[in-house]
């Protein structure tokens, strides 16, 4: 049998590193279909930190796409698992037959599914991408994204799968003995990316709570984002006093980020699509409820796991937030499907499906 090849077709260092390390530590030892990777970006020590994997790096999307297409044409039994598919050339190859549906398996990350960019280039490309998506052999995604995808592509097979968020299961009970009182701290957004709509989110938080809460905005990632960070800071200072606004411009290491999250009482995410599952998982693990946009289908995954969900359209106050905290504290977090290690079973099944080992 031909070994499955995994494709990280865009240079998204943080997520690519998370996926590679997860495969190296959790999957490669038990499956030959979890070892071969083609990745856009620089090695930056990844090969050394992932010795169980064979990783080929490419300088850009186009060079990787050309290599994938060549392999697909040379051997029609070769199957590919695309992790977050942001590479236009690969979509066009699927549409034109350069890659066959039986070769194309896609794990939806969120931004690769929704059509939120307003630029002319994107508006012209989206219809072609929708046509190509009808030809995918199988999609893997959250419950909410599967539901969203099935509305336009009901004939494409869909399987439940969660991004392998870096988590320590021993921390599942860390919030149970914490007392929450006094001024609330609200986390706004999961990164410095504009998709978080930080300014609109700050205005929404201010409309709900006024200048009575402390707002923390993590914007250390992506890099070279100083102008937008300053734009958000100035907009925030028009709404909140300086003591109640903390805009973080430096990237935090994982442990420091965990410490930051534990200081919060609420997460506020205004974006209208599924993203930031990693941050949501870490907040939920710490017993911190989240406010979501009703258009963000991840609420379906949360309610399926009996987790409280607050919406941006709700009338929020401290009593409602504290009640959500109490509800969340009563949930057995060791049973949540999108937590580590529970998502591992889904990955093992996904590998078997993509490799053709199970129907």
Curated annotation (Swiss-Prot):
One GO CC annotation: plasma membrane
Protein name per the record: TDP-N-acetylfucosamine:lipid II N-acetylfucosaminyltransferase
Biological processes annotated in GO: enterobacterial common antigen biosynthetic process; fucosylation
InterPro entries named in the record: WecF (IPR009993)
Pathway linked to the protein: Bacterial outer membrane biogenesis; enterobacterial common antigen biosynthesis
Recorded family membership: Belongs to the glycosyltransferase 56 family.
Glycosyltransferase among keywords: yes
Main function: Catalyzes the synthesis of Und-PP-GlcNAc-ManNAcA-Fuc4NAc (Lipid III), the third lipid-linked intermediate involved in ECA synthesis.
Any one GO molecular function term: 4-acetamido-4,6-dideoxy-D-galactose transferase activity
């Amino acid at each position: 049998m031909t070994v499955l090849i995994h494709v990280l077709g865009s240079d998204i260092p943080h997520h690519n590193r998370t996926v590679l390390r997860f495969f190296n530590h959790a999957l490669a030892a038990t499956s030959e279909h979890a070892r071969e990777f083609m990745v856009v970006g620089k090695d930056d020590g990844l090969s050394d930190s992932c010795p169980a994997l064979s990783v080929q790096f490419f300088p850009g999307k186009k060079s990787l796409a050309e290599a994938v297409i060549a392999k697909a044409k040379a051997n029609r039994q070769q199957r590919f698992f695309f992790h977050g598919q942001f590479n236009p050339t690969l979509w066009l190859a699927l549409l034109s037959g350069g890659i066959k549906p039986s070769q194309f398996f896609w794990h939806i990350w969120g931004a690769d599914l929704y059509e939120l960019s307003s630029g002319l280039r994107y508006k012209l490309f989206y219809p072609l991408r929708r046509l190509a998506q009808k030809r995918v052999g199988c999609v893997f995604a959250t419950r909410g994204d599967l539901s969203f995808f099935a509305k336009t592509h009901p004939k494409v097979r869909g399987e439940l799968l969660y991004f392998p968020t870096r988590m320590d299961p021993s921390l599942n009970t860390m919030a149970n003995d914490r007392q929450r009182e006094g001024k609330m701290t609200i986390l706004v957004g999961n990164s410095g990316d504009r998709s978080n709509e930080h300014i609109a989110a700050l205005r929404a938080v201010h409309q709900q709570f006024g200048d009575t809460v402390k707002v923390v905005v993590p914007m250390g990632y992506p890099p070279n984002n100083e102008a937008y960070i300053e734009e958000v800071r100035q907009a925030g200072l028009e709404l909140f006093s300086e003591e109640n606004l903390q805009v973080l411009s430096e990237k935090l290491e994982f442990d420091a980020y965990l410490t930051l999250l534990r200081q919060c009482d609420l997460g506020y995410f205004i974006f209208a699509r599924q993203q930031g599952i990693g941050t949501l998982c870490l907040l939920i693990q710490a017993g911190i409820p989240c406010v979501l946009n009703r258009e963000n289908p991840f609420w379906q995954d949360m309610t399926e796991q009996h987790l409280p969900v607050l919406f941006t359209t709700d009338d929020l106050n401290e009593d409602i937030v504290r009640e959500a905290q109490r509800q969340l504290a009563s949930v057995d977090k060791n049973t949540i499907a999108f937590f580590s290690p529970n998502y591992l079973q889904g990955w093992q099944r996904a590998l078997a499906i993509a490799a053709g080992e199970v129907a």
